[in-house]
């Protein structure tokens, strides 16, 4: 199994259990999230509670909640929305911190394509949800979620050069 960690913080952000597709010249990875129910679920065992005097809600766990699988699996923490100015400020700092950690061709490709990827994200800024890794470190990567028209499940966007592949 492969796990992808934030290169700056070491937070686990993704694994190969969630396939990705490259967008914006490979600078961004798009990963499809899915709403799931967490906690116990009602199991119908064929009994007729009304005939047996049981309560209709018997056996239902009130603690069951809906979560997005990626957020739950990697304990991503949602952040307040950014406006354009805040986002550009974050990206400048992130690029400054990440670039020296990249090597050779990866660094060159990142420098060449990050501006277009940033513009791509800026076009969606009003629709984005922002997440950080479990440590909630200020300098860590942001993970972006949004909803495509007609879809109930959000895709997530990762800045690919900021991820470090670890074999487990």
From Swiss-Prot:
Residues 1-168 form the TCTP domain. Keywords: Calcium, Cytoplasm. One of its GO terms (cellular component) is cytoplasm. Its main location: cytoplasm. Pfam families: TCTP. InterPro entries: Mss4-like_sf, Mss4/transl-control_tumour, TCTP, Translation_control_tumour_CS, Translational_control_tumour_p. One of its GO terms (molecular function) is calcium ion binding. Gene3D superfamilies: Metal Binding Protein, Guanine Nucleotide Exchange Factor, Chain A (2.170.150.10). The keyword Calcium applies. Coiled coil: none annotated. Involved in calcium binding and microtubule stabilization. PANTHER family: TRANSLATIONALLY CONTROLLED TUMOR PROTEIN-RELATED, TRANSLATIONALLY-CONTROLLED TUMOR PROTEIN. Belongs to the TCTP family. This is Translationally-controlled tumor protein homolog. The gene is TCTP.
């Amino acid at each position: 199994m492969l796990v992808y960690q934030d290169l700056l913080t070491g937070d686990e952000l993704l694994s190969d259990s969630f396939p990705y597709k490259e967008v914006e010249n490979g600078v961004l990875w798009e990963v499809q999230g899915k709403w799931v129910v967490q906690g116990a679920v009602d199991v119908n065992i064929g009994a007729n509670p009304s005939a047996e005097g049981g309560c209709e809600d018997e056996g239902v766990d009130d603690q069951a909640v809906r979560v997005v699988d990626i957020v739950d699996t990697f304990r991503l923490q949602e952040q307040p929305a950014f406006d354009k100015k805040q986002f550009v400020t974050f990206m400048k700092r992130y690029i400054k911190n990440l670039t020296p950690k990249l090597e050779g061709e990866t660094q060159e490709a990142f420098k060449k394509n990050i501006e277009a990827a940033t513009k791509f994200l800026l076009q969606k800024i009003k629709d984005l949800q922002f997440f950080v890794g479990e440590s909630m470190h200020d300098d860590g990567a942001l993970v972006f979620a949004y909803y495509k028209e007609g879809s109930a499940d959000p895709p997530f966007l990762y800045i690919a050069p900021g991820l470090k592949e670890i074999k487990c």
